[in-house]
A protein has these predicted regions:
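Pyridoxal 5′-phosphate
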Residues: 1-183
Length: 183
């Protein structure tokens, strides 16, 4: 029997040996700033480009569509603020859920202070958001629907596909932002 049973893998998972070795290699052999013009910077940029290409291939998109950030909070901020600013001429309504990560909730609260309408869908007793809730909330003024794929506290799987269908059905100009950090 193990000394410890670890139940927090959704927050942080033990690093695989292969990953730890690669991180060590990058920290000791490839430590150049990828924006620098010297040899170490060039090598770091090559490794970064390769990682971007591998990620794009895995996701089935173009390498120019891949952005590396410091973590989920920064990524959520960039996605939500960027989408809101880009879409604001078509409406100023964002649909999200009341059970999002603080990275999302704080960002939409900031936008609310700027006059945006924020609809926060409330979960049922089991922590679930229904497809009907999303469908009812989305309209032609909705420019963004932001929801996590899996809730970071209770593990609820949110209706991402239903959100995409609701946007299409309502012909809303909305983009769909999915925080998949816990998925």
């Amino acid at each position: 029997m193990p000394d410890e049973i670890y139940y927090d893998n959704s927050a942080t998972t033990r690093t695989r040996e292969e990953s730890a070795k690669l991180v060590y290699e990058m920290l000791t052999d490839c430590y150049g700033n990828p924006s620098s013009l010297h040899r170490r910077g060039f090598l770091a940029q090559q490794r970064l480009d390769k990682a971007r290409e591998q990620t794009a291939e895995t996701l089935g998109c173009q390498s120019g569509e891949i952005y590396f950030t410091s973590g989920g909070t920064e990524a959520d901020n960039i996605a939500i603020l960027g989408a809101a600013r880009a879409q604001q001429r078509m409406g100023k309504k964002i649909v999200t859920t009341a059970i999002e990560h603080d990275a999302v909730l704080n960002t939409v609260k900031f936008l609310e202070g700027e006059g945006w309408e924020i609809v926060r869908l409330k979960p049922d007793r089991e922590g679930k958001i229904t497809a009907q809730q999303v469908l009812d909330a989305v309209d032609n003024q909705t420019v963004l629907v932001s929801m996590m794929a899996v809730n970071n506290e209770v593990g609820t799987i949110l209706p991402i596909e239903a959100a995409a269908r609701a946007i299409a059905l309502k012909k809303a100009p909305a983009l769909l932002h999915v925080d998949a950090v816990q998925a």
